[in-house]
């Protein structure tokens, strides 16, 4: 599958779901341009947060048509008080007062997340102008995780040389435990399946099978056991070096009896450092299309953008979020 075909497939899937996505960063031109494209192609309904007058003026300057977008100013929206009351209740164990909650709800990330929590939007995409922490912290506090997830994690969908792969976790967890890695493997496989991947999961390491030793290898072995405990039907193996995971010739030599080695398509990196380096190496030197990070484990979809995101990146991430939202309804 080429990058172009995959992007077209994403948009077609998202259009079929026709979800409602909130974009909090209405003062960013890239967000407005992406919204224009999404609305023009009837991919999803869009709410943009910010000053409606300024958004309309900037859209006119850029030659954009946002007539069908919902433009919402959190500072004057009548839901602000209701959202503040809900947030104060959600965070009462942290002694958040109603006055503090009112101030917090003026923040675009919190207001957008509360819209998703209340069903006023099906998902949120942010991060073009804000940090990852600013984007996803509200979701931890408001939307929270599904019962079967102890952590929020992420995958990137990677289109490389005609192959569709998933890399996880490349954006959220710095140093996951063996148990968390096993859970991330299971959840990543489930997310990958939403996007047409028949998951064969490789838990990556610097060692393949029992060829090496050390605490990191032991962690990969324990992660494999946890993944199999959580989902006995999952096609997963490890520890695997990357070449053994993807190259059938290497796999025959190093792991000849593995159902995953040589044909893996979901790759679980040992930590955030390795995962982030891995996906960016594939993106920058292998010219892979990287779509994500796609957050997983939350009750409702919220996805983060890189501050270097292009307009096509934003369009793809909104499409991903729309598909995630549709899959839950």
UniProtKB/Swiss-Prot annotation:
EC number annotated for this UniProt entry: 2.3.1.8
GO biological process: acetyl-CoA biosynthetic process
Keywords per UniProt: Acyltransferase, Cytoplasm, Transferase
Induction: Activated by RamA and repressed by RipA and RamB.
Major subcellular location class: cytoplasm
Reaction(s) this enzyme catalyzes, per UniProt: acetyl-CoA + phosphate = acetyl phosphate + CoA
Pathway: Metabolic intermediate biosynthesis; acetyl-CoA biosynthesis; acetyl-CoA from acetate: step 2/2
GO cellular component, as recorded: cytoplasm
Origin superkingdom: Bacteria
Annotated localization: Cytoplasm
One of the record's GO molecular function terms: phosphate acetyltransferase activity
Protein family according to the UniProt entry: Belongs to the phosphate acetyltransferase and butyryltransferase family.
Name this polypeptide is given: Phosphate acetyltransferase
Organism: Corynebacterium glutamicum (strain ATCC 13032 / DSM 20300 / JCM 1318 / BCRC 11384 / CCUG 27702 / LMG 3730 / NBRC 12168 / NCIMB 10025 / NRRL B-2784 / 534)
């Amino acid at each position: 599958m080429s990058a172009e075909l995959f992007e077209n497939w994403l948009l077609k899937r998202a259009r079929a779901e026709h979800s409602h996505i909130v974009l909090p960063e209405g003062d960013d031109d890239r967000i407005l341009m992406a919204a224009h494209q999404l609305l023009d192609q009837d991919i999803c309904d869009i709410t943009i947060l910010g000053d409606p007058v300024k958004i309309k003026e900037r859209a006119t300057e850029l030659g954009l048509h946002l007539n069908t977008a919902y433009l919402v100013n959190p500072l004057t929206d009548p839901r602000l008080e209701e959202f503040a009351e809900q947030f104060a209740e959600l965070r009462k164990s942290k002694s958040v007062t109603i006055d503090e909650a009112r101030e917090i709800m003026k923040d675009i990330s919190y207001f957008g997340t509360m819209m998703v929590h209340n069903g006023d939007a099906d998902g949120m995409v942010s991060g073009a102008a804000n940090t990852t922490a600013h984007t996803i912290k509200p979701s931890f506090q408001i939307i929270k995780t599904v019962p079967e997830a102890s952590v929020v994690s992420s995958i990137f969908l990677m289109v490389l040389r005609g192959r569709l792969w998933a890399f996880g976790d490349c954006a959220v967890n710095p140093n996951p435990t063996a148990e968390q890695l096993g859970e991330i493997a299971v959840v990543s496989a489930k997310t990958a399946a939403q996007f047409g991947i028949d998951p064969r999961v490789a838990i990556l390491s610097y060692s393949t099978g029992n060829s090496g030793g050390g605490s990191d290898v032991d962690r990969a072995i324990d992660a494999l056991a946890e993944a199999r405990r959580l989902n006995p039907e999952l096609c997963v193996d490890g520890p695997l070096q990357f070449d053994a995971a993807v190259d059938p010739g290497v796999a025959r030599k190093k792991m000849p009896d593995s159902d995953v080695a040589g044909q893996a398509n979901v790759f679980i990196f040992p930590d955030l450092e390795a995962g982030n380096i891995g996906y960016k190496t594939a993106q920058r030197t292998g010219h892979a299309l990287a779509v994500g990070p796609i957050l997983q484990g939350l009750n409702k979809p919220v996805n983060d953008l890189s501050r270097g995101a292009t307009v096509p990146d934003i369009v793809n991430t909104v499409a991903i979020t729309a598909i995630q939202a549709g899959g839950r309804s």
